[in-house]
Amino acid sequence: MSQIDKASRRQKIKDRSRKQVHGNEKKPRLCVYRSLSQIYAQLIDDDNGKTIMSVSSMSKENRALEGTKCDVCRIVGLQLGEKAKAQGITKVIFDRNGFRYHGRVKALADGAREAGLVF
């Protein structure tokens, strides 16, 4: 499968799932983006169109992390869950953004669940 086919396939899945996934202030959308070497996660309030918080493997505290990509993703999920609990957010809607729920995306979700987020 060529790169263009993969990108268009992911975009179609993303568009289909975005019709059903909608976050608000009390239950924001946990949006995940996975690049080749990094991972980014945001809590988004779709009603107001604002990002509540974001955590990534590129942030200052995460740049020096050792281990596999999956280990780093789990740590990013833990950090996101801890920050969300500090702001009083316990329930979220998981948006895998067209990526398969497997590998690094699953590791981030498991880390967020370990930190106490419910989805």
Swiss-Prot record:
Keyword Ribonucleoprotein among UniProt keywords: yes
Ranges annotated as biased composition (Basic residues): 9-21
One Pfam short name: Ribosomal_L18p
Gene Ontology MF annotations: 5S rRNA binding; structural constituent of ribosome
Stretch list, region Disordered: 1-26
GO term, biological process aspect, one: translation
One CC-aspect GO term: cytosolic large ribosomal subunit
Keywords: Ribonucleoprotein, Ribosomal protein, RNA-binding, rRNA-binding
Keyword RNA-binding part of the UniProt annotation: yes
Subunit structure and binding partners: Part of the 50S ribosomal subunit; part of the 5S rRNA/L5/L18/L25 subcomplex. Contacts the 5S and 23S rRNAs.
Described purpose of this protein according to its UniProt entry: This is one of the proteins that bind and probably mediate the attachment of the 5S RNA into the large ribosomal subunit, where it forms part of the central protuberance.
Annotated family: Belongs to the universal ribosomal protein uL18 family.
Name this polypeptide is given: Large ribosomal subunit protein uL18
Source organism: Chlorobium limicola (strain DSM 245 / NBRC 103803 / 6330)
